[in-house]
């Protein structure tokens, strides 16, 4: 049985750990709030850009954009896995990387060649341990990541797709739906999918395009791809902070419960020791008398 001093030492150790996890929870809460504000601010722009492209979708067959290329057969796919640079965020990294692993195996089973790209130190170390060769790796997808990092990534993959080095580009990342709902998903960013909105003959205000709809659409397509990258990165960062906040809250609560259990154990051991000492004193007194 542990001595009161040993139990007291362990209680103090758990209390110190609880201070750390509580601080990390508070920091993650603040960062999650800031990150979700960025997601919410970027969403209207991304939605409006998509809506404008959809309104011009009937022109997709007459423009010659490399980003609309649809190969007869998918021979090679580029997968970008976006994980975190740090841990202590529950199943955020493990769930995502498991999905990446399954997707790679699924494509290879169909005879499709896969090239893997990783963003985040956790993803990089995962693939290194699994002996998966990475074509590119990035560690700058974090709180400071924004349009510049997203545009750099988008430009690289747009070039890979345009010169037919790959037939499809997929991003596997954690999507943010709400503060209580985030989950890893696969997004096919290239070839660009043209979604038609509305029906033919539907009433609505007449829209005038300058210089002309075809030119506007050709310039909008790269913009849509880049805004998709921005959206994915911002959602991944926000989801990471939410996952870390939840994990640190769970750790703080668990530490609190452990402190209660250890305190009760400490009191029992201390009480037993006092009772034993009293019994020894009484026994000694009776022996003398």
Curated annotation (Swiss-Prot):
Keywords: ATP synthesis, Cell inner membrane, Cell membrane, CF(1), Hydrogen ion transport, Ion transport, Membrane, Transport
Gene3D superfamilies: 3.40.1380.10, ATP synthase, gamma subunit, helix hairpin domain
Transmembrane regions: none
GO molecular function: ATP binding; proton-transporting ATP synthase activity, rotational mechanism
A Pfam family recorded for this sequence: ATP-synt
Any GO CC annotation of this UniProt entry: plasma membrane
Domain of life, source organism: Bacteria
Membrane-topology descriptor: Peripheral membrane protein
Family annotation (InterPro entries): ATP_synth_F1_ATPase_gsu (IPR035968), ATP_synth_F1_gsu (IPR000131), ATP_synth_F1_gsu_CS (IPR023632)
Keyword Cell membrane: yes
Record localization: Cell inner membrane
Chief place of localization: membrane
SUPFAM superfamilies membership: ATP synthase (F1-ATPase), gamma subunit
Gene Ontology annotations of biological process type: proton motive force-driven plasma membrane ATP synthesis
Keyword Membrane part of the UniProt annotation: yes
Signal peptide range in chain numbering: none
Subunit: F-type ATPases have 2 components, CF(1) - the catalytic core - and CF(0) - the membrane proton channel. CF(1) has five subunits: alpha(3), beta(3), gamma(1), delta(1), epsilon(1). CF(0) has three main subunits: a, b and c.
PANTHER family: ATP SYNTHASE GAMMA CHAIN (PTHR11693), ATP SYNTHASE SUBUNIT GAMMA, MITOCHONDRIAL (PTHR11693:SF22)
UniProt function note: Produces ATP from ADP in the presence of a proton gradient across the membrane. The gamma chain is believed to be important in regulating ATPase activity and the flow of protons through the CF(0) complex.
The family this protein is said to belong to: Belongs to the ATPase gamma chain family.
Name of the molecule in the record: ATP synthase gamma chain
The organism of origin for this protein: Leptospira biflexa serovar Patoc (strain Patoc 1 / ATCC 23582 / Paris)
